[in-house]
Amino acid sequence: VYHRAIGVKRYRITAKTAGGHSWSDYGSPSAIHELSKLVVELTSMKLPGSPRTTMNVGKISGGTSINVIASEAALELDLRSEGEESLAELVSQVEKKIARANTLKSTSQAGVTFEAEVIGQRPAGGISADHPLIQLAQESIREQGLEPTLTSGSTDANIPLSKGYPALVLGITSGGGAHTTNEFINLKPIEKGLEQLINFVRSISSL
């Protein structure tokens, strides 16, 4: 039962340089090298464990050939937190590091620039585990002989929860290997999962 929404903010950060030939222009800044330095700096940041806060560089692209000093490279950065204030603080720190990277003499004098574009944003929120909706959801699961688990996630419920409206997300089966090539769901529990979902919808009318 998802009753807490994780706040999310995502960036595409692009490094740009003049580029050049790997031999004749050796020593000229590479967008890939400069972006890699920024990745190391960002991922070295200490993040709070409570509320849980995470950072992930999930994608890197750039360059045109093995013997070319890259003139452009980009990364996609995912920031998450169960706390809105913690996410805002992390966002502030990340943006300051990007701004600082643009003002360093070693980069600015060499013609290196960094640009940050927001490519995704989801607000945080949540309702108490004691809320009637959550109690009904847990009861519907127990009726199927299963023990419910309360958790947080980034789902379609983020928007209503962030605006103070009661909302939740119910799972209908189990699985594993999320976001890997081995991701899977178990088919057998789906029948019970659908039954608990139907029972939950019916029980809402009693509120």
Model-flagged regions — what are they?
Residues 2-4, 9-207:
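Metal-dependent amide/peptide-bond hydrolase catalytic core
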